[in-house]
From Swiss-Prot:
HAMAP family the record matches: RNase_P
GO molecular-function terms, A-Z: 3'-tRNA processing endoribonuclease activity; ribonuclease P activity; tRNA binding
EC supergroup of this enzyme: hydrolase
Originating organism: Exiguobacterium sibiricum (strain DSM 17290 / CCUG 55495 / CIP 109462 / JCM 13490 / 255-15)
Gene behind this protein: rnpA
Subunit architecture: Consists of a catalytic RNA component (M1 or rnpB) and a protein subunit.
PROSITE patterns from the UniProt entry: RIBONUCLEASE_P (PS00648)
Protein name as catalogued: Ribonuclease P protein component
Catalyzed chemical reaction(s): Endonucleolytic cleavage of RNA, removing 5'-extranucleotides from tRNA precursor
Pfam families: Ribonuclease_P
Assigned keywords, A-Z: Endonuclease, Hydrolase, Nuclease, RNA-binding, tRNA processing
Length: 116
């Protein structure tokens, strides 16, 4: 995922937290903030130290980025997303992460269409 497609600055994270809508399941919390001027969605990740050691946290982040790339065509383009991983995400495979995130994105209303 390209760096311009990531939410990186603290101000951007805080804007998504305060003005964005949140949807959650057991594995992830997703905050979504609509940005009309954007042509592509951006992703910010937060994985707590409670999830596990650095290896586990980095693996969860890689799986989330991979899932977002996989579902890139199905996500609304003009949103900033902040994805917070919960404890069960540490024991998930890449496919399970992708399925869980798809479920959360569908519930939040930013899913455009089915990917085959």
């Amino acid at each position: 995922m390209k760096k311009e497609y990531r939410v990186k600055k603290d101000k951007e994270f805080q804007a998504v937290f305060t003005r964005g809508a949140s949807v959650a399941n057991r594995q992830f919390v997703v905050y979504a903030l609509k940005k009309e001027q954007q042509t592509h969605f951006r992703i910010g990740l937060s994985v707590s130290k409670k999830i596990g050691n650095a290896v586990v946290r980095n693996q969860v982040k890689r799986y989330v980025r991979e899932a977002c790339q996989l579902h890139e065509a199905s996500l609304a383009p003009n949103y900033d997303f902040v994805i917070i991983a919960r404890n069960p995400a540490a024991k998930m495979t890449a496919q399970e992460v992708a399925d869980s995130l798809r479920h959360v994105f569908k519930r939040s209303g930013v899913w455009k269409r089915q990917v085959k």
